Amino acid sequence: MTDKLSELRQTINQLDDEILALVRRRMVLAADVIAAKNGGAAYRPGREAEVMARLVASAPDLPAGLVVNLWRQLMTASTALQSDSMTIAVHRDAMAVAGWHFGGFFTTIGCDDLASVRQAMADGADIALLPAGCEAGMAGWLLGEEGLHVIARTPPVGSSTLLPVWMIGRQPADPVTEECTLVARQGTNGPELEVVSGRLDGAAGGGARVIGVIASNGKTD
């Protein structure tokens, strides 16, 4: 091994130690935030989306997926500090994204189909994950479920290996700057979902229901 290569590796090792120290400091601060929130919502998908969008924009020389992957794990670990008892009902086609998004910190319930996901939520699961392609079924379900809301679409950037997934929770997503509104209605051929740019306040009208206002998806790698 040349002296130059040895020096470079030593520098990388030092950087790794510094990164780890910063991660530990971040976790301490996350615990302080939890104490200051005094019982507020543990999971804030809007806040996460805005943080990731800011970080991706501040590092245009890095792949967006790299930034999102790193902070996804940090944010999930921080959420688990406040509440590690969340239960996630996961459609079988969303299992890969569930593992990526929640990192194994929470209990997951594998579900074969939409009906199984609905039952798991009826039985008390906190969050449900449905893959893209289930929009009609999701719209029909949430039209009659005032207590459930779409709170996110994940991953927040395009991925060649992970299919996009809808996330459903029991509280509306926290507001962010860049948003889109999801409206469910009965169409000519059955339930359908409309995605509207921005925030639509108030009732959708015509038997429709706003089933979620979520962060707009950001940059694609």
Explain the meaning of each model-derived region.
Residues 1-221:
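Domain-level signature for soluble enzymes in the chorismate/prephenate branch of the shikimate pathway
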